């Protein structure tokens, strides 16, 4: 009979005793300078078992183990198992009441502890597990001094507590066969008697079962490492070498922490297992590229399925693609991917993961309701129709074509908004940690015809002043923007008969109040006397935001309002009061009372604030203290380089540029900064952007790495080590990313656009100097002809000449002016850099597939929906196909002669430069004969249109309407606009051959076909 067969039938402790008999002199445990053989360990186990045995321990009796991590703790667990009991290891850092409550719930009689902790557990019978008791028997090792209770594979060896989502943690009953299944799965980990396994987990953590018992079951050595060593990457690295450790199991968070400081920390190990959270592909890539262990294992498994359920041997090829599968099940473990009806789903389809086999725990001790929910018996999954016991993991996964399983998300309450998967439970956790609320529920709201949004209903604490604004600021420091909920304070939350928050009742009330508010807004908009402005505005906010109980001092934006919803506010205010407010007025007076006072004042703010010019000029000097240590940059196209750092890769231009980059043989690798919480999410967002524009072909995507970060955060939100490593890796920087919003003020663009550019400058000047190529906008010069009468704008002109009319422009353009000035200031110091100023970027010249959120697309599509178009004479919109820009960027940046220059990426010939009137005529030829009206009449028709709230021009309306100079709007200031000089651009592209740089009739036809295919405009064929 094999060892494994014997252990499978006899149980976990029998396996340990096998090695006591066969390898007594092998090392069993190492704790600092103290080392103990299996013979010596058994002596101490017998010592303690002899004392504990006097208490007549019943089979599977729960024995509390409150002993610090160390040799004494290992002895305690082994002694309990020797007598047939169940180990209940607990964390001594827990509060006394929590520990005592949990032990009491298990009807615990005996607690093993140490002298210093004994007083904490006075209500239980305590037995001390100190070093003293080892001296009771100094007569050496005696085999089977204390007869072992033979228990078998179904013996409950441990009770571990999970951190339950509600109330008291759930006690999980772990069985012997679940642990031995792990110990003898040689495909995942194969320990030899000469191996040394690190024990770094708290004994109450399920990973400790792997560290202690798979090691002892295989006759290997446990090496205990204290917490202060584990959390110090340098100390951990030194200890791994000092103690010749061969295997370690680390959480994802710890792995990320260690690798960020020492990429090759695990190079001497045979096995590194990691799990507990979604793995970060970029971290795995760093490990595999910088001295990897022999095997890097991505492990997955809930406590209820004995720590490791599935495993995957990670490869460099996979992580470069952003993939970190959780792999395949261990031996004697079965996995099922099922739909809501518990039927298997097809390969590639997302379903919930269910687990069967020896891995599955007995259940939650004394929790029948929880067991009924999580541990199921079904017969249709077995071949012979016999019952199969499975555990419901609550995790959404899919089967890949390789046969490996990929983790997708948690199933509980998950919602997807604007491409991001959001777990309301995570938001609830953040709210509760704020100490500002005593209760909360976070719900996704789906309203017909409207975008899904998140509302957080919070019960404020009564022991102090409460402010939604403070709570909002607290969340913004901890959650990414896409997870920010709309906040609503409530006095209480309804409960079910089981005492849980009644989410259905909360949602029903919310939907009723929102619907009622919408009806009141509809009625009051057509009635002159609709009550005071505060009451009316509160009703309007309830309708627009989808929340109620709005405080007078609540900020529209802190409640979750977006610029699109702010535009809807302005429409309703104009229809109700005949008052055309500006978007800036909402940002200046965002509270209910503040905006109501603006309405009551009865006039719109149209005066340009020239004092803001000082802010722009001051910000343009932010890089003044950044030195350029070398004016030489590497040739990024050379065979030894080819490493590109790219921002904006999920934007329209960025996706096309990324596609061009990776198709070039001289580009070896591209690292893309993507706003996301982790690398896995960043990779998915990046691939989603490529798919959105039909660019998601598989070729060469292995060159691409997505880095989770944020342009506007210091050092992109990376650690100093990560930022420095990125700087050393990079050959060239292409800064294409930007926040683009035509109605938000400068302050809303400042972080991403200005500080994002500053971060790129820091990256370019950290370590070796790298060339920095910045994509600005042709609009950065503003309506120069209106103010100066100029007829041509030179490419290398000093932007300072245009600062006088900067206050008249929109916040986006102001931020680009500041950002470009930062680049020019660094060029003056010798930084190798190029500035590009593209015009309005349209779809590609082959397919016409473009960004329908951009200005000109909104104008065209919105006007077609309206049936009217504005008369705007002599307005060139310098429209260019996106593929012209990507080609020009790559060609121009390939020549160092172009460093320090600026290039206008606009139509290169007068024939290709299509003005707005010509565009309307081309649309007419394509079947869209729009009625031409004066600009102000067009605005009036648009603002009164019954379908305005669904017109793509709605978010643009404030900036289209607002008069900024002598009753002229910003768009009108661009009449008779100067032409853009293209001398630099034409010279640099002369050897590239003929490039299409404008939008003609056939180009527009392809755009229209794309709009029709997307359902944005009706067909005119």
Curated annotation (Swiss-Prot):
SMART domains from the UniProt entry: PKS_PP (SM00823)
Record GO biological process: biosynthetic process
Segments of this protein annotated with the region Adenylation (A) domain: 17-418
GO molecular function: ligase activity; oxidoreductase activity; phosphopantetheine binding
UniProt keyword Ligase, yes or no: yes
Residues carrying O-(pantetheine 4'-phosphoryl)serine: 563
EC number(s) stated in the UniProt entry for this protein: 6.3.2.-
Gene3D superfamilies documented for this protein: 3.30.300.30, 3.40.50.980, ACP-like (1.10.1200.10), Luciferase, Domain 3 (2.30.38.10), NAD(P)-binding Rossmann-like Domain (3.40.50.720)
Family according to the record: Belongs to the NRP synthetase family.
Function: Nonribosomal peptide synthetase; part of the gene cluster that mediates the biosynthesis of aspergillic acid, a hydroxamic acid-containing pyrazinone with aliphatic side chains that originates from leucine (Leu) and isoleucine (Ile). Aspergillic acid has antibiotic properties and was shown to be lethal to mice.
Protein name: Nonribosomal peptide synthetase asaC
Gene from which the chain derives: asaC
């Amino acid at each position: 009979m094999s060892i494994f067969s014997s252990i499978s039938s006899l149980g976990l402790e029998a396996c340990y005793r096998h090695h006591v008999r066969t390898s007594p002199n092998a090392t069993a445990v190492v704790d600092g300078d103290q080392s103990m053989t299996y013979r010596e360990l058994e002596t101490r186990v017998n010592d303690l078992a002899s004392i504990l045995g006097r208490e007549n321990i019943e089979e599977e009796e729960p024995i509390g183990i409150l002993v610090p991590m160390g040799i004494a703790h290992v002895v305690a667990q082994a002694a309990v198992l020797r007598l047939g009991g169940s180990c209940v290891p607990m964390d001594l850092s827990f509060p006394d009441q929590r520990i005592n409550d949990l032990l009491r719930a298990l009807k615990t009689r005996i607690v093993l502890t140490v002298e210093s902790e004994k007083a904490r557990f006075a209500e239980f019978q305590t037995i001390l597990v100190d070093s003293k008791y080892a001296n009771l028997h100094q007569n050496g090792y005696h085999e089977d001094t204390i007869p072992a209770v033979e228990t078998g594979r179904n013996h409950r060896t441990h009770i571990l507590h999970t951190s339950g989502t509600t109330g008291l943690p759930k006690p999980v009953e772990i069985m012997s066969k679940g642990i031995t299944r792990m110990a003898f799965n040689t495909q995942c980990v194969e320990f030899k008697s000469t191996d040394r396994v690190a024990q770094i987990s708290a004994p109450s953590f399920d990973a400790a079962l792997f560290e202690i018992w798979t090691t002892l079951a295989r006759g290997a050595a446990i090496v205990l490492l204290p917490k202060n060593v584990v959390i110090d990457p340098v100390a951990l690295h030194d200890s791994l070498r000092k103690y010749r450790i061969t295997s370690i199991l680390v959480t994802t968070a710890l792995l990320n922490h260690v690798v960020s400081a020492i990429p090759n920390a695990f190079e001497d190990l045979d096995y590194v297992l990691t799990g507990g959270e979604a793995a970060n592909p970029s971290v795995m890539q760093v490990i595999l590229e910088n001295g990897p262990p022999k095997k890097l294992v991505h492990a997955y498994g809930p406590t209820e399925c004995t720590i490791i359920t599935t495993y995957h041997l990670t490869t460099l090829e996979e992580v470069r693609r952003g993939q970190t599968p959780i792999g395949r099940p261990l031996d004697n473990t079965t996995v099922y991917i099922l739909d809501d009806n518990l039927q298997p789903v097809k390969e590639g389809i997302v379903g919930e993961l269910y687990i069967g086999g020896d891995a599955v725990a007995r259940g939650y001790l004394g929790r029948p309701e929880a067991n009924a929910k999580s541990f199921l018996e079904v017969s249709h999954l077995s071949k012979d129709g016999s019952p199969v016991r499975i555990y419901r993991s609550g995790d959404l996964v899919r089967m890949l074509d390789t046969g490996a399983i990929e983790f997708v998300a948690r199933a509980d309450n998950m919602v997807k908004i604007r491409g991001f998967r959001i777990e309301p439970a995570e938001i609830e956790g953040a709210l509760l940690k704020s100490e500002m609320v005593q209760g909360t529920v976070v719900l996704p709201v789906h309203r017909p015809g409207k975008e899904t949004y998140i509302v957080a209903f919070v019960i404020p604490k009564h022991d102090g002043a409460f402010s939604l604004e403070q709570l909002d600021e607290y969340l913004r420091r901890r959650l990414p923007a896409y997870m920010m909920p709309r906040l609503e304070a409530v006095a209480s939350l309804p409960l079910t008969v089981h005492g849980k928050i009644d989410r259905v009742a909360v949602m029903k009330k919310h939907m009723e109040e929102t619907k009622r508010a919408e009806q009141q807004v509809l009625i009051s908009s057509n009635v002159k006397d609709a009550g005071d402005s505060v009451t009316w505005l509160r009703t309007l906010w309830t309708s627009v935001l989808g929340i109620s109980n709005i405080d007078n001092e609540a900020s529209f934006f802190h409640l979750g309002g977006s610029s699109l919803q702010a535009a809807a506010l302005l429409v309703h205010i104009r229809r109700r009061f005949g008052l055309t407010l500006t978007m800036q007025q909402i940002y200046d007076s965002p509270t209910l009372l503040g905006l109501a006072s603006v309405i009551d004042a009865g006039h719109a703010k149209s005066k340009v604030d020239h004092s803001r010019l000082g802010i722009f000029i001051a910000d343009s000097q932010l890089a003044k203290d950044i030195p350029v240590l070398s004016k030489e940059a590497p040739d990024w196209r050379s065979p030894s380089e080819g490493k590109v750092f790219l921002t904006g890769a999920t934007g329209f231009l960025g996706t096309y540029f990324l596609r061009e980059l990776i198709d070039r043989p001289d580009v070896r690798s591209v690292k893309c900064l993507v706003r996301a919480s982790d690398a896995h999410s960043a990779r998915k967002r990046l691939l989603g952007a490529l798919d959105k524009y039909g660019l998601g072909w598989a070729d060469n995507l292995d060159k691409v790495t997505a880095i989770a970060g944020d342009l506007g955060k210091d050092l992109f939100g990376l650690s100093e080590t990560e930022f420095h490593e990125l700087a050393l890796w990079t050959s060239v920087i292409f800064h294409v990313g930007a926040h683009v919003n035509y109605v938000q003020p400068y302050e809303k663009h400042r972080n991403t656009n200005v500080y994002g550019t500053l971060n790129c400058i820091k990256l370019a000047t950290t370590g070796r100097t790298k060339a920095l190529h910045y994509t600005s906008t042709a609009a950065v010069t503003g309506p120069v002809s209106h103010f100066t009468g100029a007829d041509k704008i030179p490419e290398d002109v000093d932007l300072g000449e245009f600062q006088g009319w900067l206050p008249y422009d929109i916040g986006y353009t102001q931020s680009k002016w500041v950002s470009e000035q930062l680049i020019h200031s660094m060029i003056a110091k010798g930084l190798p850099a190029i500035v590009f100023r593209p015009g309005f970027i349209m779809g590609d010249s082959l397919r016409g597939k473009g960004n329908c959120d951009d200005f000109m697309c909104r104008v065209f599509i919105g006007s077609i929906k309206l049936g009217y178009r504005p008369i705007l004479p002599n307005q060139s919109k310098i429209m260019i196909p996106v593929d012209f820009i990507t080609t020009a960027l790559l060609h121009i940046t390939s020549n160092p002669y172009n460093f320090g220059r600026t290039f206008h990426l606009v139509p290169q010939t007068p024939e290709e430069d299509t003005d707005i009137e010509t565009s309307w005529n081309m649309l007419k030829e394509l079947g869209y004969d729009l009625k031409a009206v004066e600009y102000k009449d067009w605005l009036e028709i648009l603002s009164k249109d019954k379908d305005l709230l669904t017109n793509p021009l709605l978010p643009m309306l404030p900036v289209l309407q607002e008069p900024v100079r002598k009753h002229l709007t910003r768009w009108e200031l661009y009449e008779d606009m100067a032409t853009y000089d293209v001398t630099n651009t034409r010279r640099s592209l002369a050897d590239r051959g003929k490039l299409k740089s404008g939008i003609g009739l056939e180009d527009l036809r392809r755009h229209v076909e794309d709009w029709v295919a997307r359902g944005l405009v009706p067909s005119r064929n």
